[in-house]
């Protein structure tokens, strides 16, 4: 299930970003930064477990310029199109 991130998701988003950052995949972000940009995030939830397994944020600079930030999908859920769905959700907004 794909949805906009909620305040209760911030710690999980932060944990996922830190995990990915420690593996050299994305840049780290602070809790404050995530709270401040929460409206930019989408999360993907495993319907069976209710666990957040993917995250993505897009920051819009101008009408025709944006940047995908903090794209991460749990290793166990990769190669299923989840990252693509997250990016498409961010772009379609």
What residues fall within each predicted segment?
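Short loop/turn motifs at secondary-structure junctions and domain boundaries
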Residues: 32-38
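Conserved acetyl-CoA-binding loop-helix of GNAT-fold acetyltransferases
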Residues: 73, 79-92
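Conserved beta-strand in the GNAT
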Residues: 43, 50-59, 66-72
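Residue-level recognition of short loop/turn positions
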Residues: 48-49, 76
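Short amphipathic alpha-helix that is part of the acyltransferase structural core
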Residues: 1-27, 45-46
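A generic local structural motif
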Residues: 27-31, 88-89
């Amino acid at each position: 299930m794909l949805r906009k991130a909620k305040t209760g998701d911030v710690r999980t988003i932060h944990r996922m970003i830190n995990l990915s950052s420690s593996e050299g995949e994305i840049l780290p972000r602070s809790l404050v930064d995530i709270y401040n940009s929460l409206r930019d995030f989408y999360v993907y939830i495993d319907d069976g477990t209710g666990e957040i397994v993917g995250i993505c944020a897009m920051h819009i600079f101008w009408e025709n310029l944006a940047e995908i930030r903090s794209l991460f999908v749990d290793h166990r859920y990769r190669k299923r199109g989840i990252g693509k769905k997250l990016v498409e959700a961010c772009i379609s907004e």
